[in-house]
UniProtKB/Swiss-Prot annotation:
Pathway: Porphyrin-containing compound metabolism; protoheme biosynthesis; protoheme from protoporphyrin-IX: step 1/1. This is Ferrochelatase. It comes from Campylobacter jejuni (strain RM1221). Catalyzes the ferrous insertion into protoporphyrin IX. Its EC number is 4.98.1.1. Fe cation binds at residues 185, 262. Belongs to the ferrochelatase family. PANTHER family: FERROCHELATASE, FERROCHELATASE, MITOCHONDRIAL. It is found in: Cytoplasm.
Length: 303
């Protein structure tokens, strides 16, 4: 068996899971860099209690749940129906399904393979490193003898970028804008200053896509969303860009593969009230045929 596990932070599937998500996220040492785990757990509890009600209110506006789990499950189901070389499943970091339960579903021996596929095109310790570490620890804990392969960044992949360009131009044919905003999830500047590659990878990716789209847009803007707290984060903020823009724009969520609260609520709803300009949002790759084509080709090239 070749078991491919998509890795993501996850999204709450009900209002109760909002607290689970926040508690686990802020207890992640790659997110909240407090070395003492007891102190980190206490601070995570305080932050969770302060934020959970607001998060639940936001989720109510999306129908009470994030679409991330359903979309990822659909992606796995479609890939499993399309071929029989790989078995696809997914693991979340902060809400179910967790690594323990997913790995226990399968009987794996030394002749099998596990391919860990973080659904993040750019590397960051807060996403890729954290996800891989949790999975590798659980594989070791369960004494699974299968060979383990890991996938890191894929933002340079030609097929992946062809898909992005196709999705952008398809949306542009319905909403003719001359400005394209690439919105990436922000990170605290302190994490970047410690050597995290995320900002560099995002900048590189934007340059790749600008070259492919230069004949279709007059202006490209890279902005960062989802800032939390008083510390310095990557800039400019997507909300500030939209508040100061007067012309029509398209937004592509460049750091996301699957739609989630950050895209559906934050970009699609919350920022609408802040924006001066008329803008439209391009969906993430999700369970699209083009994304599946990229995934299968990428995996076949590993062998």
């Amino acid at each position: 068996m070749k078991l491919v596990l998509f890795l993501n932070m996850g999204g709450a599937t009900n209002l109760q899971d909002c607290e689970v998500f926040l508690k686990n996220m802020f207890n992640d040492p790659y997110i909240l860099g407090i070395k003492n785990r007891f102190l980190r757990k206490f601070v995570a509890w305080i932050i969770t209690k302060a934020r959970v009600k607001a998060m639940q209110e936001n989720y109510k506006k999306m129908g009470g749940k994030s679409p991330l789990n359903e979309l990822t499950q659909s992606l796995c189901d479609k890939l499993n129906l399309k071929q029989d070389e790989f078995k696809f499943d997914f693991v979340n970091l902060y809400v179910p399904p967790f690594a323990t339960e997913i790995l226990q579903k399968y009987t794996l021996n030394a002749s099998d393979e596990i391919i860990l596929f973080p659904l993040y095109p750019h590397h960051s310790c807060t996403t890729v490193t954290s996800s891989l570490e949790v999975l590798q620890n659980e594989i070791s804990k369960q004494k699974i003898q299968a060979k383990v392969k890991t996938i890191d960044i894929f933002y340079k992949n030609e097929l992946y970028n062809e898909m992005i360009v196709s999705h952008i131009l398809d949306k542009k044919s319905k909403f003719d804008a001359k400005i394209l905003i690439f919105s990436a999830h922000s990170l605290p500047q302190s994490i970047i200053d410690k050597g995290d590659l995320y900002e560099k990878h995002v900048n590189d990716h934007v340059e790749i896509l600008k070259e492919k789209l230069k004949d279709h847009f007059d202006e490209f803007i890279l902005a960062y969303q989802s800032k939390l707290g008083p510390v310095k984060w990557l800039e400019p903020n997507t909300s500030d860009v939209l508040a100061n823009l007067n012309d029509k724009a398209l937004i592509y969520p460049i750091s996301f593969c699957i739609d989630c609260s950050e895209t559906i609520f934050e970009l699609g709803m919350e920022y609408k009230h802040l924006a001066k300009c008329d803008y439209d949002l391009i969906s993430c790759p999700n369970n699209s045929d083009e994304f599946m084509k990229f995934i299968l080709k990428y995996l076949s090239d590993l062998n």
